[in-house]
From Swiss-Prot:
Native source species: Staphylococcus aureus (strain N315)
Name the record gives this protein: Uncharacterized lipoprotein SA2273
Keywords linked to the UniProt accession: Cell membrane, Lipoprotein, Membrane, Palmitate, Signal
Entries under Gene3D superfamilies matching the protein: 2.50.20.40
Signal peptide interval: 1-22
InterPro entries: Csa, Csa_sf
Length: 264
């Protein structure tokens, strides 16, 4: 009888330890997930910034990678990627480097086509058109004979100029993951076609599918902040081996010297 009571007590203690351990683990996971969501929210707070000139006065995260005299450079990029069944992956995107030291901004508009041959080799065809930004206007810096393309470039709007994530904190049922080895982290949320950002993308791009997209946020580097890491987001309407329809966007703040090397 005594032995039976001791055995029962022992089992109860083991179960209690497991329960407490499980609660501690879940608390840590929930805390980390909240931290990841908060990290993304800090980046998404810059949406919308309708006037790109405002980035000259926006301060980003600074760490030991920055020279004390360096005000830093913002890198913003937006692009639409479409691959119909059996076709090439075609994209039209723009990248802009906004130098806070010189208060100048330059970049390029990129038209890209990616195909895969029968042997599995990938082939890329890229065409870059250099641009600059002045008074919130995109201006080609080299002559463009194609008037339609010229207008497309001049009228280009980055997602940060019209996107809005004011309700991001209310997003629920997200799939949040974290890899401490890289470190990297991500969050995925299924959207609906009534979402403001989805409506804005459909208004500006020829998106053939009626399928509502999944919003995927990706980040790398220290969760507390790092100029070494990066943050990007995607609206994935269709993603598979045969067909792709997605929109990609990124805003990052980097040391200017590092960006000068990247542009050269």
């Amino acid at each position: 009888m005594i032995h039976s009571k001791k055995l029962t007590l022992g089992i109860c203690l083991v179960l209690l330890i497991i329960l407490i351990g499980g609660c501690i683990i879940m608390t840590k996971i929930n805390s980390r997930n909240a931290q990841i969501k908060d990290t993304f929210n800090q980046t998404l707070n810059v949406y919308p910034t309708k006037n790109l000139d405002d980035f000259y006065d926006k301060e980003g995260f600074r760490d030991q990678e920055f020279d004390k005299r360096d005000k830093g450079t913002w890198i913003i990029n937006s692009g639409m990627y479409i691959q119909l069944k059996g076709g090439a992956l075609k994209s039209r995107a723009m990248v802009l480097y906004i130098n806070r030291n010189t208060r100048t901004a330059k970049g390029y508009f990129l038209i890209s086509e990616t195909t895969e041959d029968k042997k599995g080799y990938v082939h890329n065809k890229d065409k870059k058109y250099p641009v600059k930004m002045e008074r919130n206007r995109i201006i080609p810096t080299k002559p463009i004979t194609d008037e339609k393309l010229k207008k497309e470039i001049e009228n280009f709007k980055f997602f940060v100029q019209y996107g809005n994530f004011k309700d991001f904190k209310d997003y629920k049922d997200g799939d949040i993951s974290y890899n401490p080895n890289v470190p990297s982290y991500s969050a995925k949320y299924q959207l609906n076609n009534d979402d403001y950002n989805v409506q804005q993308l459909r208004k500006r791009y020829d998106i053939s599918t009626k399928r509502a997209p999944e919003l995927k946020l990706r980040g790398s580097g220290d969760l507390k902040g790092s100029s070494v890491g990066s943050k990007e987001l995607e609206f994935n309407f269709v993603r598979n081996k045969e067909e792709n329809v997605y929109f990609s966007d990124g805003i990052n703040f980097k040391p200017t010297e590092e960006m000068n090397h990247e542009q050269n």
